[in-house]
Amino acid sequence: MKLNLVQIFFMLLMLLLGLGMGLGLGLHMATAVLEESDQPLNEFWSSDSQDKAEATEEGDGTQTTETLVLSNKEVVQPGWPEDPILGEDEVGGNKMLRASALFQSNKDYLRLDQTDRECNDMMAHKMKEPSQSCIAQYAFIHEDLNTVKAVCNSPVIACELKGGKCHKSSRPFDLTLCELSQPDQVTPNCNYLTSVIKKHIIITCNDMKRQLPTGQ
C-alpha cells in the first residue's frame, strides 16, 4: 500500500510530538531528582571539575595558615654560627614552619634585590673558612628594614621563642628559604635548594639595638 504525502506528513508530525513529550518528561524528572534529593550538588559534577575545586580551596588555605618563625635570640659571635634547626610543628591548630637563624648584620637577611634570589649566591659570603660544616637552613627577608622593625609595634602574642613574647606581621613577607640539598656538606662546597615564599613572620623584639626581628 502506497502512502501519499499527507499520510507521510502526519506520521512525521506525530513522531516529532512524541519526541518532544519524551524530552520534556526527562527534563522534569531530572529536575525533580535534584530538588528532592539530599545528595550534594558536587556529586553531579565531573570528577575533573571537583578535583580542581578542592585543589583551589586547599591552596587558598595553605597561603593563609602557614607561618614562618625565625628566631635571632642570640647575637652572632666571631666564628661560624651553629646550624639553625628547621622542622614542622603544630601550634594553635595551624601548621607552622619553625626555623632558627642567626644574623651577622641587617644585610644578612634584609635583601631588597629581587632579581637575585638564588641561595647558592646569597649564601656564598657566609663560607668564611674552608672545611667547616655548611649552615643547614637560612632565611632571607626581602623587605625594607623599617617595615620589619614596624612589626614590633604590633600587639604581643605568645610564642615558644625565648621570653615567650613575640609580634606577628600584619601581612605576608617576601622570603627566600635556603636549605642544604644534602646533609654533612662542608665549605666551600655547600649546595642549597631555593624556595621563594610569602609568609607572615613572627619575631622577638628584645634588645633592638643589637638584633632585628625575624619571623613567621
Swiss-Prot record:
Coarse class of the protein's main subcellular location: secreted
Statement: the UniProt record of this protein carries the keyword Glycoprotein: yes
| The organism's place on the tree of life at top rank | Eukaryota
A GO CC term assigned to this protein in UniProt = extracellular region
Q: Which Pfam families match?
A: RnaseA
Q: Which GO terms describe its biological process?
A: defense response to Gram-positive bacterium; heterotypic cell-cell adhesion; positive regulation of cell-cell adhesion; positive regulation of flagellated sperm motility; regulation of fertilization; single fertilization
SUPFAM superfamilies (UniProt xref): RNase A-like
Outline the segment boundaries, as ranges, of region: Disordered. Answer: 43-65
Q: Which UniProt keywords apply?
A: Cell adhesion, Fertilization, Glycoprotein, Secreted, Signal
Q: Which InterPro entries does this chain map to? A: RNaseA, RNaseA-like_dom_sf, RNaseA_domain
Where does this one sit in the cell? Secreted
Question: Residues of the signal sequence?
Answer: 1-26
Q: PTM per UniProt?
A: The N-terminus is blocked. Glycosylated.
For this protein, what is any one GO molecular function term?
Answer: nucleic acid binding
- SMART domains attached to this UniProt entry: RNAse_Pc (SM00092)
Per the record, the similarity remark reads: Belongs to the pancreatic ribonuclease family.
Its job: Secreted proximal epididymal protein required for post-testicular sperm maturation and male fertility. May be involved in sperm adhesion to the egg zona pellucida. Does not have ribonuclease activity.
Q: What is this protein called?
A: Inactive ribonuclease-like protein 10
